[in-house]
Design a protein with these regions (language model features):
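Conserved PLP-binding catalytic core of the aspartate aminotransferase-like
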Residues: 114-115, 128-162
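Short acidic/glycine-enriched loop/turn segments that link adjacent beta-strands
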Residues: 63, 137, 174-176
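PLP-dependent enzyme catalytic core of the Aspartate aminotransferase-like
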Residues: 5, 12, 161-162, 171-192
Length: 192
């Protein structure tokens, strides 16, 4: 994860170079400290910035596709409105979004569960010499397979047969080596 101060430096540098920056904060709700990582506080001061957020990941409603963006660049907003589908948000999505964001009990419990499980999983993976776990900031963990001769596909194939779904990261650019990624689930599912 990138801190707000580092994001500010990036946005400032891009502004000097006339570069528009879009930051995807789809997974920010899973972070331990949203204020330390979110670029939303920068939006009023930088017209070369747009922050994108979604609620479907955190609220486990992937089919809903409910998201929003924030920018202080009025010209960019007008261009978006010009090309926006007039029915981009249906009444069910709007209603669900309101309910989701008002459910503070769910938000609190989910954040606590993710925090606890994220720490537990990371600490457990640290004890396995054939794996290198990267400290997670969201609801998933990136793991490098250090066991020579074992590929990410081998691990994926083995786990899918056990009805465990992980992501084979072999198609991810910039990941040199064998990597997998998996989501943090319930304590019972994570223990499996």
């Amino acid at each position: 994860a990138i801190s707000v101060s580092d994001l500010k430096t990036i946005v400032q540098t891009c502004q000097k170079l006339d570069i528009f920056v879009m930051i995807d904060e789809t997974y920010i709700e899973f972070a331990s400290s949203i204020p330390a990582l979110s670029a939303v506080c920068l939006v009023p001061d930088y017209d070369n910035l747009m922050v994108l957020r979604g609620v479907s990941k955190f609220f486990a409603a992937p089919g809903l596709r409910l998201g929003y963006g924030m920018t202080s660049n009025e010209d960019f907003r007008n261009i978006l409105k010009e090309y926006q589908n007039p029915w981009s948000l249906n009444s069910i999505g709007a209603f669900a979004g309101e309910l989701f964001l008002q459910d503070t009990d769910y938000i609190q419990k989910t954040r606590q569960l993710i925090e606890t499980e994220r720490t537990r999983i990371y600490e457990t993976l640290q004890t396995i010499p054939e794996l290198k776990a990267f400290k997670p900031s969201a609801n998933f963990v990136l793991v490098q397979i250090l066991n020579e001769g074992v590929t990410s596909f081998d691990v994926f194939d083995n786990l899918i047969r056990q009805k465990l779904m992980i992501r084979d990261c072999s198609s991810f650019e910039q990941l040199d080596g064998e990597f997998i990624r998996f989501c943090i689930m319930s304590p019972e599912e994570n223990t499996r």
